[in-house]
């Protein structure tokens, strides 16, 4: 699941580009070729969160 990402400067929805980066694993350089606005390019380059590891490891081994 990819959360919606809107450029705060121009208001363009850049969720499809984020989907390509995170889910399809397409390189940032390739994705940015289709993005014309410099504000959107900057947001995609700097504010993409890495995929989170949601596994929880116990801190104490209680036996």
Swiss-Prot record:
GO terms for molecular function: DNA binding; DNA-directed RNA polymerase activity. The keyword Lipid metabolism does not apply. Keywords: DNA-directed RNA polymerase, Early protein, Nucleotidyltransferase, Transcription, Transferase, Virion. It is found in: Virion. It catalyses: RNA(n) + a ribonucleoside 5'-triphosphate = RNA(n+1) + diphosphate. Its EC number is 2.7.7.6. Induction: Expressed in the early phase of the viral replicative cycle. It is an enzyme of class 2 (transferase). Transmembrane segments: none annotated. GO terms for biological process: DNA-templated transcription. GO terms for cellular component: DNA-directed RNA polymerase complex; virion component. Part of the DNA-dependent RNA polymerase which catalyzes the transcription of viral DNA into RNA using the four ribonucleoside triphosphates as substrates. Responsible for the transcription of early, intermediate and late genes. DNA-dependent RNA polymerase associates with the early transcription factor (ETF) thereby allowing the early genes transcription. Late transcription, and probably also intermediate transcription, require newly synthesized RNA polymerase. The DNA-dependent RNA polymerase used for intermediate and late genes expression consists of eight subunits 147 kDa, 133 kDa, 35 kDa, 30 kDa, 22 kDa, 19 kDa, 18 kDa and 7 kDa totalling more than 500 kDa in mass. The same holoenzyme, with the addition of the transcription-specificity factor RAP94, is used for early gene expression. This is DNA-directed RNA polymerase 7 kDa subunit. It comes from Rabbit fibroma virus (strain Kasza) (RFV).
């Amino acid at each position: 699941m990819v959360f919606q990402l809107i450029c705060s400067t121009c208001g363009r929805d850049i969720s499809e580009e984020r989907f390509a980066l995170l889910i399809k694993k397409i390189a940032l350089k390739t994705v940015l070729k289709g993005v014309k606005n410099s504000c959107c390019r900057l947001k995609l380059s700097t504010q993409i969160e890495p995929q989170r590891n949601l596994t929880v490891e116990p801190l104490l081994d209680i036996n």
